[in-house]
Amino acid sequence: MAVTLTPTLTLTSSDITADALSISVTDSLSLGSNDARITRQISPNDVDPGGTQIFDTNLGKSYIYAKNTHATLTIYLAAAADTATGASWMALAPGEFAFFPWAGVVDLFAHSGANGQGVATAGLEYIVFEA
């Protein structure tokens, strides 16, 4: 049985430009009959080579929600087991989140950088919706 996920993004501001900003977009995403929904809260660190793997290519095309729940550390997302922050595709500061499509052709890792600041408490909440 196919299921549907409906993401909505709204951006508003009254002072970022001379004109008021008000953008809202919605989509309807079909997840398919064999979809996997993986929900976890993890402590990504720099001890494991490349951090913690949060997505494996065997899932195929997916939609990923990720939120940095750590109070002080930035969480980096990268498609390779590499804790160099310059190799990261995304950096989520404390409280920041992202929802994005993932082609599923490479793995996805989360880490807190190569500076020895492993996250001792949960720092990344993520959900993978397989398309």
Predicted feature descriptions by range:
Residues 2-17, 114-131:
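C-terminal interaction-tip segments
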Residues 66-72, 112-114, 129-131:
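Short, flexible beta-strand-to-coil junctions
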Residues 58-61, 67-88:
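Short, surface-exposed beta-strand/strand-loop-strand elements in extracellular ectodomains
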